[in-house]
């Protein structure tokens, strides 16, 4: 966020988390995290509702580059979308991931990196052992990699590899990130 003059990322996050009227996205109407100036797609408390938006943006970026259209975003932009392991089973998330696989299967450019933050607990219930890994890794035409969030060097290497793949090959990928819930 430091690269955008006048941005106040810490204040913006705190204003969002407290539903402050100073929140630049919601104006205090809802706890929403996002930023137009920083190109952060708003993420709401409705689980998985932002995945279709991320898919749509990646689809539009892919189409714009192929159609030689102008865009306010760099042509090598990558959409990054994080979600929790409980969201991986929500209909909106499943729909976005399936649409991503469908487009990738057809060779359509879709520069999106999905990051599943898996702490093994879906809101208040345990996620079935192995379910998230199996369902995410089985999506056709989507690159899948897992990393342990408690091992930052390994995580950084995996994340950089996937981001570079998405950026250069313009196809979707999933980073399945094992995390710890405090």
Please identify what each model-predicted range represents.
Residues 1-110, 122-141:
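Cofactor-binding active-site loop characterized by glycine-rich and histidine/acidic residues
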Residues 107-182:
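Thiamine diphosphate
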